[in-house]
């Protein structure tokens, strides 16, 4: 996982959760990298307007962000070759806004078989020794038909609030 210093705090937090999901599936925790560092394959993620890496890839003609630019909570998956020096192939998850990037990261978890309910009722994924994602995963998400979608619990502080604080540090994704 290419960890960009400029990434939004909530996006960084979710990237960490997705790394845990990958570890649940493979038994191996993906390394975080801050440069190419000789990595054969990598996951790069960023939010338009908050990611110099996305800007550089787009300027070099390696990444097309026009399909998601300006679209509420949209993200794209693009597998590209040699995105950065030292990285052979990368899955680039780009979001138009913070939630778009977060939904894109969680889409990766779904692709490898992790249920969104893994934290709620311990729905553990099937073990896989390897996970292969190729250009068949290239896609652009649709604009959601409902803005501000989410799971809202208004009066359950005792149970849900304490659970959220234990697992996420607070009730807000930051």
Model-derived regions, located:
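Functionally constrained cores in energy, signaling, and assembly domains
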Residues: 1-3, 21, 32, 45, ...
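Secondary-structure transition/capping residues
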Residues: 29, 33, 116-119
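Short, well-ordered secondary-structure micro-motifs within conserved domains or adaptor modules
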Residues: 32-67
């Amino acid at each position: 996982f290419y960890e960009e210093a400029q990434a939004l705090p909530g996006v960084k937090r979710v990237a960490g959760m997705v790394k845990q999901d990958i570890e649940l599936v493979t038994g191996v925790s993906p390394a975080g990298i801050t440069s190419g560092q000789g990595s054969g394959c990598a996951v790069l993620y960023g939010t338009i307007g908050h990611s110099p890496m996305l800007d550089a890839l787009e300027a070099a003609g390696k990444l097309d962000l026009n399909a998601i630019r300006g679209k509420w909570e949209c993200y794209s998956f693009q597998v590209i070759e040699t995105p950065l020096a030292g990285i052979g192939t990368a899955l680039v998850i780009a979001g138009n806004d913070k939630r778009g990037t977060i939904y894109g990261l969680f889409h990766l978890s779904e692709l490898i078989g992790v249920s969104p309910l893994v934290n709620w009722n311990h729905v553990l994924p099937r073990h896989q020794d390897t996970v292969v994602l190729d250009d068949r995963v290239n896609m652009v998400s649709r604009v959601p038909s409902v803005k501000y979608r989410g799971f809202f619990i208004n009066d359950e502080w005792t149970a849900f609030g304490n659970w959220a604080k234990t697992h996420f540090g607070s009730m807000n994704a930051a």
